[in-house]
Amino acid sequence: MGWSQDLFRALWRSLSREVKEHVGTDQFGNKYYYIPQYKNWRGQTIREKRIVEAANKKEVDYEAGDIPTEWEAWIRRTRKTPPTMEEILKNEKHREEIKIKSQDFYEKEKLLSKETSEELLPPPVQTQIKGHASAPYFGKEEPSVAPSSTGKTFQPGSWMPRDGKSHNQ
């Protein structure tokens, strides 16, 4: 089936006046082609095309990063001229340098944050736990002057006698 499809494509290209120019190859072996604008046999104007023939023919084997960023920009028409191999290698080297610098920065930041967090945090304080969180009340209840109400239970405030001195005045 594969060779018959290729034969049909070759026959169709010869009839449709579609000319495929080889523009370049990347370090992974992918080949890039440019097909200029042309008129087909019905007189329709077919706009230019930019095509990549992947080194691994199966779409299943494709992984992100198999096509360099510069070539991808050329295929998507965000870049007018195809990239050179020197440019791709220079940009790859630049990306590696940035990756190394960011890793160094991350390590320094980690050390600084560890030092400052040790300086800023107070030592842990021993807390005394009274009762249990699920208990409705725990510990010694002190009588309060103010009445308290929680749902259906009402607790009137307790009576506290005044000092004798303030009562006589």
UniProtKB/Swiss-Prot annotation:
It holds the Pfam family NDUFA12. One of its GO terms (biological process) is cilium assembly. Highly expressed in ESCC cells. Also expressed in heart, skeletal muscle, liver, and in fibroblasts. Belongs to the complex I NDUFA12 subunit family. It is linked to Mitochondrial complex I deficiency, nuclear type 10: A form of mitochondrial complex I deficiency, the most common biochemical signature of mitochondrial disorders, a group of highly heterogeneous conditions characterized by defective oxidative phosphorylation, which collectively affects 1 in 5-10000 live births. Clinical disorders have variable severity, ranging from lethal neonatal disease to adult-onset neurodegenerative disorders. PANTHER family: ADH DEHYDROGENASE [UBIQUINONE] 1 ALPHA SUBCOMPLEX ASSEMBLY FACTOR 2, NADH DEHYDROGENASE [UBIQUINONE] 1 ALPHA SUBCOMPLEX ASSEMBLY FACTOR 2. Its main location: mitochondrion. Residues 146-156 have a biased composition (Polar residues). This is NADH dehydrogenase [ubiquinone] 1 alpha subcomplex assembly factor 2. One of its GO terms (molecular function) is protein-containing complex binding. It is found in: Mitochondrion. Residues 116-169 are annotated as: Disordered. The modification Phosphoserine is found at residue 134. One of its GO terms (cellular component) is mitochondrial inner membrane. Acts as a molecular chaperone for mitochondrial complex I assembly. Complex I functions in the transfer of electrons from NADH to the respiratory chain. The immediate electron acceptor for the enzyme is believed to be ubiquinone. Is involved in the initial steps of cilia formation, including removal of CP110 from the mother centrioles, docking of membrane vesicles to the mother centrioles, and establishment of the transition zone. Induction: By MYC. Direct transcriptional target of MYC. Keywords: Chaperone, Cilium biogenesis/degradation, Disease variant, Mitochondrion, Phosphoprotein, Primary mitochondrial disease, Transit peptide. It comes from the Eukaryota. Interacts with ARMC9. Coiled coil: none annotated.
